[in-house]
A protein has these predicted regions:
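Small beta-barrel nucleic-acid-binding modules, primarily SNase/OB-fold domains
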Residues: 1-155
Length: 155
């Protein structure tokens, strides 16, 4: 009789363990090791992460010429991420044409992709469809109206 009670408990524990492992893996928590510019970071597992829906000014690099506010945009993203672990949520299209992981980046439950746009240091990339496209466009419109970040001196 005791075995009849034990086996369902063992099966239940195994199922719970599988769900917990999947849940933990889905969290995908990392440290940021480098901020390349306002829309691209590198994390501790070596992946380069491109923030979905964010188009930040470029900084001077072997691949691009510096654009106005490029350094300020990068510095703002560095401040947003400083000393914080980030959660990476890969988008529907996992990689861009340069091999970067396309993802939403969260720090302390704040969606960093939206925050940098809302703070005025990046534009919403509306060239393609993604989950937060309308929200990010609204954040950009709000930042422009408030004349914050790189929109401070725009007409």
């Amino acid at each position: 009789m005791r075995n009849y009670v034990r086996w369902p408990l063992v099966v239940l524990m195994a199922v719970l363990l599988v769900f917990l492992l999947r849940w933990a893996r889905s969290l995908d928590i990392h440290e940021v090791t480098e901020v390349y510019d306002g829309d691209t970071i590198r994390i501790d597992d070596g992946r380069n992460i491109r923030l979905i829906g964010v188009d930040a000014p470029e900084v001077d690099s072997p691949y691009s010429k510096e654009e106005p506010f490029g350094r300020e945009s990068r510095e703002h993203l560095e401040k947003l991420l400083a000393g914080r672990k980030v959660q990476i949520r890969v988008g529907a299209t996992p990689l861009d044409r340069y091999g970067r992981t396309l993802a939403y980046v969260y720090a302390d439950d704040v969606l960093i992709n939206g925050r940098i746009i809302r703070d005025g240091w990046a534009q919403a990339d509306v060239r393609f469809d993604y989950k937060n496209r309308d929200l990010f466009a609204a954040y950009e419109k709000e930042a422009r109206a408030k004349r914050i970040g790189m929109w401070k001196h725009s007409p």
